[in-house]
Amino acid sequence: MMNTKTFTSVNRVIYDDNYSLKQQQKSSFINQFLKGLLSAITLLFFILLLIFAENTLFGLGFGDENKSMMISKSLNAFFDLHSPKYLQLNFLIVFRFFILSFTLFYTLIKNFTNLYWHRATIKKYLPWFVLYLVIATISFLLFFTFFSVWPKEVFNLVFLLLVLFLLNLSYEIFNYFISKKTNPLLYDNYKNLIIAMVFQALLLLFVIITPLVWINTGKSPNFLFVDNRFYTRIVDIFTVQSGKNFIILIAFFFFLITFIVLANTNFFALVINKRYDRNYVKNNLWFILLLFSAIFIWLLRVFAYKHENENLPVGNNHLLWVYILQSFFAIIILILYMVFTLKKRLSVKSSLNTLLNLVVTQTILSLSLFLVTLFNSKSVVSLINVFITITVQMSVFGIYIFQNKNISTKLLVLLKVIMILIILTAAIVGFDYLLTSDHHNNYLFSNIQPKMNLVQIMLLLNFSLNFTLISYLTIKFAMVIFKINKLNKELNNEKK
């Protein structure tokens, strides 16, 4: 009888283990499928938005001028703030862009993040996956279909944020009860959830009420900058020097920053409890790779924009061809890095050495690109150099991350910041080339600073970040060598 019970118990344990293993494998398959589907949709969304950027992101629309947010089918007046008419049109374009972009990016990133957190409970997360994807798709489609120039209609886009908040609220409640079972120590306290949701609601309320007040305090809801008391009051606060206005500004920014911090209480709680580990950051890098892939494909399209005065000379301007050598230099650096890295793999290597090699390579690339762009005035040359160099930089990052499995979380976060900066630089160069094309003739990014344009500022920032990192590593490397030498001297003295 005892043997029969023991045999039954053993069978039960084996069955439970097999069932659990099958469930994990099934959840892993579903998770990988959803991640692949989301990746394909994300890449498609970004590629289409960028290829049709002048029509979608800048609001030119499709078809005749009646379906455009600009007066003419050109971006020549984009960010022209010299008249109330252009000021209002540009404000509405920027407002539309920020609302739709925020909703699109937030929902896509949220889905990628949640797929990581719910690897074991993926089936239960499926409804939220679909709903977040639906909101992302709506935002994407509105970029292609919504081109209203009426303030009230454009301001109605904020209600997308209300829908997003309600979805977030339902997800956070679901996540709290699910995570409470798997990680009771971290999710035992529901106060963080309540604080985050309350302050998110207050921020949303501010975003919704502000446009409503704006359009209802003027003589006409169709005019935002003419005979509008709200606009006049805002201008006075920022321009009229008085103690009252100073206190209002300080109080506004203080409460805004406080509300933003408290609205992200859950995030800070996870950071403090070290839930954002190396694997989580690597998961984020996948989204960055998708974004870079879209930028890479789009830049190939950007080369097609006509610049009659920017054609490359055929043998009559040797200096320009010297500038283009930056691209060949970047490729040579990549080859040398790959050869050196492969050679090092055959011998024992330290993580500090490999990191130093990475940072030196990135610093050389960012410095050479900045210097060439600083002295070169041809947009097409800058576009070629940036296109090649950033591709090399991202390739170097990819090689380093692929070959080093035990990168610290802090370093991964820093590399992530540098990658985002590289992508932003590439996007700005692409948009600058689009705006300065013959059809649009807009030099917005070139007129921000008298001595340096926005592209050069971004490249300088990229170099500065790499230079700061290499300075830190050089000091750390010197300290390690000093400690080793000191230890060797002590050992030699003991032997004597």
UniProtKB/Swiss-Prot annotation:
Subcellular location(s) per record: Cell membrane
Disulphide bond pairs: none
Provide GO CC annotations from the record.
plasma membrane
What stretches pass through the bilayer? 33-53, 89-109, 127-147, 154-174, 193-213, 247-267, 285-305, 320-340, 355-375, 382-402, 411-431, 455-475
- Keyword terms of this UniProt record: Cell membrane, Membrane, Transmembrane, Transmembrane helix
Membrane topology per the record? Multi-pass membrane protein
> According to its UniProt record, where is this protein mainly located?
membrane
Q: What is this protein called?
A: Uncharacterized protein UU048
